[in-house]
Curated annotation (Swiss-Prot):
InterPro entries: Leu-rich_rpt (IPR001611), Leu-rich_rpt_typical-subtyp (IPR003591), LRR_dom_sf (IPR032675), LRR_domain-containing (IPR050216). This is Leucine-rich repeat-containing protein 40. The keyword Repeat applies. The modification Phosphoserine is found at residue 71. SUPFAM superfamilies: L domain-like. One of its GO terms (cellular component) is cytoplasm. The keyword Repeat applies. SMART domains: LRR_BAC (SM00364), LRR_SD22 (SM00365), LRR_TYP (SM00369). Keywords: Leucine-rich repeat, Phosphoprotein, Repeat. LRR repeats lie at residues 83-104, 106-127, 129-150, 152-173, 175-196, 198-219, 221-242, 244-265, 266-286, 290-311, 313-335, 336-356, 400-421, 426-447, 450-471, 473-494, 496-517, 519-540, 543-564, 566-586. Disulfide bonds: none annotated. It comes from Macaca fascicularis (Crab-eating macaque). Residues 1-20 are annotated as: Disordered.
Length: 602
């Protein structure tokens, strides 16, 4: 009832009357009524050029429903209203906000992104309860000092403005956990920035920064630092002491040397692609014990040291577009799920092997790890077995590499002799690619307790039989270049599957069963006819990091796909949708996801 106290002599209905007149049709009374109950009001995308007075005064004036019912015994007690705590007025045409903002002191969330604001009202500093403020995609040129008084602020989004500097006093935001200043015109970061001791995520990408302050290492809780697309030539050595850092993005800068990270024992992802790095040495690698993703693409590397084997947790390694002519064979002993080598003058690995993908490259490198003895080709020739069918089974591959290889035979069936050759040997991989198979060999089920990798690409498969669904240790499955348009629901039993390649088939939608294989990390389904994806189901796939949807029939990309924050590689080129535009796609996955998130209706 405290909200209903009025200044002496004031007409108790006057405020309401003004509110109703000011709102017109831009803000329906039903929406205001619901907001008084829920404490949340969403006015996004209403073409507003100013905020109606009835919004600012929502908890001050007597509502319209008071006209219909003044009884204290009424079912709907209009006087028992909830203070507005969340206000969303994004995607409008607002050029300014008035100081009437102070009439909403209970606000904890204020979203005013995607407007035309050039400043913030001084009353902003009075919103002492505010925890989340989104002012992104506006026209702010000067850092709003009003923000520095918001001591309870935890999330601040100022990306896509025209800021050139950060004002003093910013360090007073001691509770800030998430700060996005990307896509501005910042040239420096003040040393006082380091006082943001609670900061967990900091995005400084797409600015004009030439350096980072040494004091950055005082941010003891920082886990995610994004400095992509700046002008950085060096990284302060103090950054190596950030013990909590897990994700570091330094792509598209001017770095010539890879920093060392002696204290960053928790670092999981290091992205330094598109720089000018010329050398990768053991000192750069030996402390990266937890690294999962290492992006070195588009640099000037000439070699990869043998010490790469120290990165035992590494899952994704991108070396594309460098000057690398050879790879250490020890690389084959890493448990990589993705290895990119395109655009290098490699002379020690045939292009045919590289085109077969990561697992084939690793197997090839492992086969070369020998201190003595004959070469692989000589050994294979000596141990190959001639079968009655005149087929040749590589016994060396079975015994040494644990591969059952009957590829590139143009066979319509896999002879029994091939499976018989396994005998008591342990087999972890099957390669029946480049044949004329119309169905999956039934005898594959005999290897269900062993096999983790299966390559059935470049065949004539139009359906998947249940035999494949019984390979419960399967982690890698290559089915590209077949005639598939669906997958059986029974594939849900493949509870260890991490990578599936369905490119160059006939799928018109992402198979439903894939959404239920929560171990999946990589889905490659380019060059099909996929017309839609379900972002809600995909968000549940928390391990999914790579999704290739290139060259399909996607007419639109659902904004909710931006919530799939675990995606590190999202490929969408070659689809007929108009948004996101090509200019967004070329910026990479992080930019695409951010673009999509900013357009989620709220």
């Amino acid at each position: 009832m405290s909200r209903l106290k009025r200044i002496a002599g004031q007409d108790p209905r006057a405020g309401f009357k003004a509110a109703g007149r000011d709102c017109g049709t831009s803000v329906p009374q039903g929406l205001l009524k619901a907001a008084r109950k829920s404490g949340q009001l969403n006015l996004s995308g209403r073409n507003l050029s100013e905020v109606p007075q009835c919004v600012w005064r929502i908890n001050v004036d007597i509502p319209e429903e008071a006209n219909q019912n003044l009884s204290f015994g009424a079912t709907e007690r209009w006087w028992e209203q909830t203070d507005l705590t969340k206000l969303i007025i994004s995607n409008n045409k607002l050029q300014s906000l008035t100081d009437d903002l102070r009439l909403l002191p209970a606000l904890t969330v204020l979203d005013i992104h995607d407007n035309q604001l050039t400043s913030l009202p001084s009353a902003m500093r009075e919103l002492e309860n505010l925890q989340k403020l989104n002012v992104s995609h506006n026209k702010l040129k000067i850092f709003p000092e009003e923000i520095t008084n918001l001591r309870n602020l935890k999330c601040l989004y100022l990306q896509h403005n025209e800021l050139t500097c950060i004002s003093e006093g910013f360090e007073q935001l001691s509770n800030l956990e998430d700060l996005d200043l990307s896509n501005n015109r910042l040239t420096t970061v003040p040393a006082s920035f380091s006082s943001l001791s609670s900061l967990v995520r900091l995005n400084l990408s797409s600015n004009q920064l030439k350096s980072l302050p040494a004091e950055i290492n005082r941010m003891k809780r920082l886990k995610h630092l994004d400095c992509n697309s700046n002008l950085l030539e060096t990284i302060p050595p103090e950054l190596a002491g950030m013990e909590s850092l897990e994700l570091l993005y330094l792509r598209r800068n001017k770095l010539r040397f890879l920093p060392e990270f002696p204290s960053c024992s928790l670092l999981k992802e290091l992205h330094v692609g598109e720089n000018q790095i010329e050398m990768l040495e053991a000192e750069h690698l030996k402390h990266l014990n937890s690294i999962l993703v290492l992006d070195l693409r588009d640099n000037k590397l000439k070699s990869v040291p043998d010490e790469i084997i120290l990165l035992q947790s590494l899952e994704r390694l991108d070396l594309s577009n460098n000057d690398i002519s050879s790879l250490p064979y020890s690389l084959g002993n890493l448990h990589l799920k993705f290895l990119a080598l395109e655009g290098n003058p490699l002379r020690t690995i045939r292009r045919e092997i590289i085109n077969k993908g990561t697992q084939e490259v690793l197997k090839y490198l492992r086969s070369k790890i020998k201190d003595d003895g004959p070469s692989q080709s000589e050994s294979a020739a000596e141990t190959a077995m001639t079968l009655p069918s005149e087929s040749r089974v590589n016994i060396h591959a079975i015994i040494t590499l644990k591969i059952l290889d009957y590829s590139d035979k143009q066979a319509t069936l896999i002879p029994d002799e091939v499976f018989n050759a396994v005998k008591s040997n342990i087999i972890t991989s099957i390669n029946f690619s480049k044949n004329q198979l119309c169905e999956i060999p039934k005898r594959m089920v005999e290897l269900k307790e062993m096999v983790s990798d299966v390559n059935l690409s470049f065949n004539k498969l139009s359906f998947i039989s249940l035999e494949l669904c019984m390979l419960q240790k399967l982690t890698f499955l290559d089915l590209r270049n077949n005639f598939l348009n669906s997958l059986p629901e029974e594939m849900e039993s493949l509870v260890r599957l991490q990578t599936i390649n369905l490119s160059f088939n006939r799928f018109k939608m992402l198979p439903e069963v894939l959404y239920r294989i929560f171990t999946l990390e990589t889905i490659l389904i380019s060059n099909n006819q996929v017309g839609s994806v379900d972002p809600q189901k995909m968000k549940m796939m928390e391990n999914l990091t790579t999704l290739d949807l290139q060259n399909n029939d996607l007419l639109q990309i659902p904004p909710e796909l931006g919530n799939c924050v675990n995606l590190r590689t999202l490929l969408l080129d070659g689809n007929p949708f108009r948004v996101p535009r090509a200019a967004i796609l070329i910026k990479g996955t992080a930019a695409i996801l951010e673009y999509l998130r900013d357009r989620i209706p709220t």
